[in-house]
């Protein structure tokens, strides 16, 4: 482990105490919890609890709050994972792809990965016809795209954004 990573871990560990961890875990479970209920669960009075939450937000530890939507009820039941391989030889191909993908609301996640391909994308669509349209009119036309491989998810076994904090 590099010295920089060790320093970051020490800094993070010093910045968060056991009560901060409890607050973060409760907010991960229920982002709509009231400050009064949160303070009871973590063993603080409401004012210091709220001050800690505000500090965690200001520090960027808490990045925001979101509603989890049911894609089945919102005409986006088909989850598709796409591998993207870029052409080699253009010096700015990764930067151009990164900039272009940011503008696509249809793409829920985009990860630059190591291995046999370059990017892993996650998208949700109504059906295969909609995905074929997205692939043909959008994904294949992104800067530097050389090859794609598509995986249609048959069953979502587990989906969570919960971070295990200790």
UniProtKB/Swiss-Prot annotation:
GO terms assigned for molecular function: sequence-specific DNA binding
PROSITE patterns: HTH_ASNC_1, HTH_ASNC_2
Record flagged with keyword Glycosyltransferase: no
Top-level taxon: Bacteria
UniProt-listed Gene3D superfamilies: 3.30.70.920, Winged helix-like DNA-binding domain superfamily/Winged helix DNA-binding domain (1.10.10.10)
Annotated NCBIfam families: PRK11169.1 (NF008370)
Protein name: Leucine-responsive regulatory protein
Organism: Haemophilus influenzae (strain ATCC 51907 / DSM 11121 / KW20 / Rd)
């Amino acid at each position: 482990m590099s010295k920089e990573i060790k320093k970051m871990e020490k800094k993070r560990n010093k910045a968060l105490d056991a009560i901060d961890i409890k607050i973060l875990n409760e907010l991960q479970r229920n982002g709509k919890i009231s400050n009064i209920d949160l303070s009871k669960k973590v063993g603080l009075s409401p004012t210091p609890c709220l001050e800690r939450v505000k500090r965690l937000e200001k520090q960027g530890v808490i990045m925001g709050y979101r509603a989890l939507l049911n894609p089945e009820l919102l005409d986006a039941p088909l989850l598709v994972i796409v591998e993207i391989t870029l052409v080699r030889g253009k010096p700015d191909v990764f930067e151009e792809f990164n900039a272009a993908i940011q503008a696509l609301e249809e793409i829920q996640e985009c990860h630059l990965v190591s291995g046999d391909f370059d990017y892993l994308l996650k998208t949700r669509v109504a059906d295969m016809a909609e995905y074929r349209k997205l692939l043909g009119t959008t994904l294949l036309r992104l800067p530097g795209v050389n090859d794609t491989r598509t995986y249609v998810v048959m069953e979502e076994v587990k989906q969570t954004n919960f971070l295990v904090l200790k």
